[in-house]
Structures are given as C-alpha cells and as structure tokens.
C-alpha cells in the first residue's frame, strides 16, 4: 500500500530491493496486490515446502546442550538512541539473513536439538520459550553476549525501549538474575531481524563457533524450566 504522491521510482526501488533479498534467501516473488494508502505499507507472505525431518523446533533442548547465538544483540536500543554510525552497523546486521547460520546447523542436524529466532521478546524471552517447551533451564553467561556497537554504552547510560518492560513481565517468576544491569537489559532488548538461538550438543559446538557464524552464550541444564542470567 502506498500514497498516491509517492514517486514511482521509490516504489520501484522498494519492490526491487525486496526481490533481491528474496532471491538471496532462495525464493521467488509470485504475484501481489497494491492499494492506495496515506502511509506506505509493505510486506510479504512466505509459502514453501519442507521435509518434516529437517524442521528445527523450539522444543527438544537437552540438559548439557550449549546455547549458541548467530547475531549480536542491541538493535532496539541502538536504533532508538545510538549514533548514526552505530545505527548503520546495526542496520547492516539487521539486513543480513540467517540463511548461512541455518545452513551450518543443517550440516550437523542430528546435534541440533532446538532452534528459535530472537525477535521481539529478546534473548531472555525467546530463550525461555525453548526452556519451557524442553523441560530444562537456560543459563545465559552475559559476559559472552555478542553486542552491536554502542549497545552496552547505551544500556549503561540507562536507555531502554518500551519493549524492555514488557519482556521482563513475560518471564516474571521464571527468571533468576545475578548479572550486570546493563547486560541484563540487553537480554530483554527487543530485536528486529535478530539472530538464531540454538541448543546444540557439545561435540558439535567447536566447529560452529570457529565458523564465525555463532557465539556461545550459555548452556541448558537439568532444572525446573526457567532462565538464569549470570
């Protein structure tokens, strides 16, 4: 949906850029519908066929699995209050697909027990979803978190997004915190185009981390389902 006064070349650039990303992801745009609207609205619906044996689910993490994250944290706070340079770095990360990370998991498919993407609920919220569905607890080592430029500085200065408070409520009563306040805040920071969070058997972790696509951020332990930030 686009306003009538929006130049046609701008609309063409939006469609062309979307097509480029879809091709990069291995897809094809087929059809569409455009209407007039005072504000621009653009989105895609994805359809596909998948081998049911190759689906990664939120459930299935085992005690002893290592938690790996494929992108830095901090898009929420950086895009809200970061410098122009910091925003550019975060946007570049947001524009990067998770395809390579997902393909690397397929290479060790049997060792991957659960996967989700880190988006609006932040690392803590989406980590809780895996822990809850798997019947284990997720311990996050906040000192190991990969962060976008400026994210820690902004969090230390007290910058928070509106999603921070909502995400804390989402895991209220299910979380134990003993970490630095700023790093805790980044675990609750809502992400746009965040990375994948994977529960992986220890024997396969070294190769994934050495690929440069993944960072070890914690482990799943045999305990009442919950989240520990330490």
Give the ranges of each region predicted by the language model.
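Glycine-/charge-enriched secondary-structure boundary and capping motifs
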Residues: 5-28, 35-42, 53, 107-112, ...
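Phosphate-binding glycine-rich loops and adjacent basic patches that engage nucleotide phosphates
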Residues: 59-69, 84-92, 112-116, 166-174
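Generic alpha-helical secondary structure signal
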Residues: 9, 84-88, 92, 99, ...
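Glycine-rich phosphate/pyrophosphate-binding loop regions near the starts of catalytic domains
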Residues: 1-88
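Active-site glycine-rich loop that binds ribose-phosphate moieties when present
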Residues: 45-55, 86-108, 181
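Short hydrophobic/aromatic-rich motifs at helix boundaries and adjacent loops
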Residues: 72-76, 96-100, 123-124
